[in-house]
């Protein structure tokens, strides 16, 4: 198990944690965490990252030691597998595919749907092979697959978490607003295009590169395990098929969303190392807007356009 005492600037550099977004995409509120600008890309101050990471890990240990849950959230393609694997490893709930509006603010209302999903899961798993055909079976299977996308990681979440850990708080704006409203502390891997003012424990770092996400998320999971005084809590549990399928679709492809800069090879090299940001699809944006309207959480700052 790795601790920040064995993590230094070199490890953060190797993981690409220092690469921010293109300077033109920055949020000025992140200025205090930026070391420099190079080839049009902001470079994050890793000395601050180390200090703030240790602060965040100490907080997470305290939450776990108190017996409270830490909800892991990261729905972008680069984060899905890591979020699921590390949350499972430390026995915590997670959202790796789609955050349902109102999960926190309307938890009592959503909880019965989670119980229904658990019941449906048992029915699907226990259905004999010879009965797995016909219109009724496929209708049930489609419903199961849809609910699995929403609830697979939170089936054991019986109460609101003591904290949430987020990869890319800009993408997960709805979750952050709900947590802020309920005064649930937010720990977040926060890139240079994010608003740090809505985050309780900012970890300045690259939230697009897989290695950066994996390193920070693994340390968060280690802190949970340390806080509970346990070994890995659930190593035998596999990553849900829906998450694996989503990752397989993307295998061998660079997530879309970044703007190319023809004629600036150095800038392109920085963008490649930093990890291309992934934009939400129009369908996902519409779903999130509908969810937000269905479960209002109060006024929040609008995220700047990527």
Curated annotation (Swiss-Prot):
Residue ranges, annotated region (Disordered): 229-306
UniProt KW keywords: Ribonucleoprotein, Ribosomal protein
Keyword Ligase included in the entry's annotation: no
GO molecular-function term, one example from the UniProt record: structural constituent of ribosome
Highest taxon of the lineage: Bacteria
GO biological process, one term: translation
Residue ranges with Basic and acidic residues bias: 229-238
Compositionally biased spans, kind Acidic residues: 261-287
Pfam families recorded: Ribosomal_S2
UniProt GO cellular component terms: cytosolic small ribosomal subunit
Matches recorded under CDD domains: RPS2
Family listed: Belongs to the universal ribosomal protein uS2 family.
Record's protein name: Small ribosomal subunit protein uS2
Species: Rubrobacter xylanophilus (strain DSM 9941 / JCM 11954 / NBRC 16129 / PRD-1)
Gene symbol of the encoding locus: rpsB
